[in-house]
């Protein structure tokens, strides 16, 4: 079941951007935002599924998707203080960042508590599976933001 779920999730991977697209940009309320390839910080919670699918199946495709997504999120979703944007919209072909904003938070430049927690969990998980210290460092920076910004 985990591998089947990972196969399904992998259909949302956009190789040109190196990310897992969160929503269909042309449907429902998302269609009114002008997005092409919206990616939400919530997706960091999905990476464990991909790492586990690689462990269970031996297919490194899932691992590679998880690492690509984590790296692009690390590069583009965070402000200088390590708070995260809720949504980053990419050009799906080139990977260029088109917009950084919120869909459910207070404002585009506000920090969203759940999003910060998802980033913390996601990068801790990435470190656990890859042993790449950059993920542990990112998790620590996100933790420091959460700890030092209680309101």
For each feature predicted by the language model, list its residue ranges.
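Glycan-recognition and catalytic cores of secretory/periplasmic carbohydrate-active enzymes
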Residues: 1-151
């Amino acid at each position: 079941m985990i591998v089947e779920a990972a196969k399904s999730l992998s259909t949302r991977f956009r190789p040109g951007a190196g990310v897992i697209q969160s929503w269909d940009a042309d449907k429902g309320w998302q269609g009114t935002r002008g997005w092409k390839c919206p990616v939400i910080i919530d997706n960091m919670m999905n990476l464990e599924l991909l790492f586990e699918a690689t462990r269970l199946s031996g297919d490194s495709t899932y691992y590679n998707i998880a690492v690509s997504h984590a790296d692009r999120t690390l590069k583009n979703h965070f402000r200088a203080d390590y708070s995260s944007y809720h949504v980053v919209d990419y050009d799906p072909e080139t990977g260029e960042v088109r917009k950084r904003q919120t869909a459910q938070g207070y404002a585009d430049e506000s920090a969203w508590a759940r999003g910060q927690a998802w980033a913390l969990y996601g990068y801790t998980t990435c470190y656990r599976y890859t042993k790449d210290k950059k993920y542990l460092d990112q998790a620590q920076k996100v933790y420091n933001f959460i700890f030092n910004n209680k309101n």
